[in-house]
């Protein structure tokens, strides 16, 4: 009887496993499509398992493939670096930070000397301190863009350059997007603004459910990155924007993306990280815009093509220290910052308080 019982248990488990695999595969045959509940639950379970194992299994800290260019300022003062860009017009690195108890700031670092030029304090339109996450910063040689939630702010580069060290800078112009912006980047033609996603039952990093897509037979995406033509939305910035700006195109992106930039050959670089004891990754994806869109989004004024950045589109990957954040390009190379040098992450497994160039 015991043997028979064990056989029934084994048979039941085998049937359930077979049905599960069949449902999982069949659910992805019609990709791209909205992610169904069954596959979403499996993906969320896998995400939680990944985070748990990544925190337990410690890989070597013998990292390669990066070269420090300059120190990241202000981390000794409680600021946490988030966004980063290289501004060619000023030949300076620009970094955005949040602070748990104070206003968010921007720092400029001279790219030639590596020395801090200034740090300015961000203020709201009404003059009160801006305490947003300031997750991304980008430039187009005329303006500096800063993102926080569904809003992208704009200040003139001239205003930043003429401001004195420690001075307040007002965020007087903004646009509203339909993505929860955690990072932004520019390539001279487009401004890219995208979402960070990892699953928690309390929904702390949730994104719009309409952004949850089955992008291939075996892959789901829960976040989106929009691309806005700089020439189209220049006049959309206002003190009190009333409508959501329509993107020119959009991309599905993987979980845990912290930075996004486009290379001169059209390829895309994404920084992926989460956790002070977990390796970061710098992924380079093929130029998916050379192919057909995966699907289209319908906006009131036009249909917008969406391209999927899938695992099969990765052309290179680089393992890096924990907490890689914003990235950009400089002289044809990807450069970026880490937040591990901030005081709140000093107990992480690898501290790197540097602006770095990557191979």
Model-predicted regions and their roles:
Residues 49-78, 242-247, 307-315:
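A short helix->beta-strand "capping" segment at the edge of beta-propeller domains
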Residues 250-311, 317:
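Loop/turn-rich, solvent-exposed surfaces of beta-rich toroidal or solenoidal domains
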Residues 104-114, 155-170, 207-234, 280-300, ...:
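Beta-propeller blade signature
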């Amino acid at each position: 009887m015991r043997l028979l019982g064990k056989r029934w248990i084994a048979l039941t488990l085998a049937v359930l496993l077979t049905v599960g695999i069949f449902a999982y595969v069949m659910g992805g045959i019609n990709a791209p499509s909205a992610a169904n509940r069954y596959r979403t639950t499996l993906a969320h379970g896998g995400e939680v398992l990944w985070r748990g194992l990544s925190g337990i299994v410690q890989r070597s800290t013998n990292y390669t493939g990066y070269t420090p260019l300059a120190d990241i300022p202000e981390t000794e003062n409680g600021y946490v670096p988030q966004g980063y860009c290289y501004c060619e017009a000023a030949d300076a690195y620009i970094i955005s930070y949040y602070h748990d108890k104070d206003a968010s700031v921007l720092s400029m670092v001279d790219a030639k000397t590596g020395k801090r030029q200034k740090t300015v304090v961000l203020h709201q339109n009404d003059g009160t301190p801006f305490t947003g996450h300031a997750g991304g910063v980008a430039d187009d040689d005329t303006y500096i863009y800063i993102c926080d939630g569904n809003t992208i702010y704009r200040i003139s580069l001239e205003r930043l350059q003429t401001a004195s060290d420690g001075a307040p800078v007002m965020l007087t112009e903004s646009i509203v997007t339909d993505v929860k912006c955690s990072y932004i980047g520019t390539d001279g033609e487009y401004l890219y603004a995208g979402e960070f996603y990892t699953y928690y039952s309390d929904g702390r990093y949730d994104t719009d459910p309409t952004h949850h897509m089955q992008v291939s037979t075996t892959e789901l995406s829960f976040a989106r990155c929009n691309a806005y033509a700089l020439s189209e939305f220049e006049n959309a910035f206002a003190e009190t924007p009333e409508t959501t700006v329509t993107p020119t195109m959009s991309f599905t992106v993987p979980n845990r993306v912290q930075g996004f930039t486009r290379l001169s050959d059209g390829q895309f670089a994404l920084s992926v990280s989460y956790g002070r004891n977990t390796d970061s990754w710098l992924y380079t994806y093929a130029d998916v815009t050379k192919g057909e869109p995966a699907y289209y989004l319908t906006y009131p004024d036009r249909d917008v093509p969406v391209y999927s950045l899938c695992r099969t589109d990765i052309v290179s990957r680089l393992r890096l220290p924990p907490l890689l954040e914003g990235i950009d390009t400089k002289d044809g190379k990807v450069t970026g910052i880490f937040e591990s040098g901030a005081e709140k992450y000093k107990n992480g497994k690898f501290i790197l308080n540097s602006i770095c160039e990557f191979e």
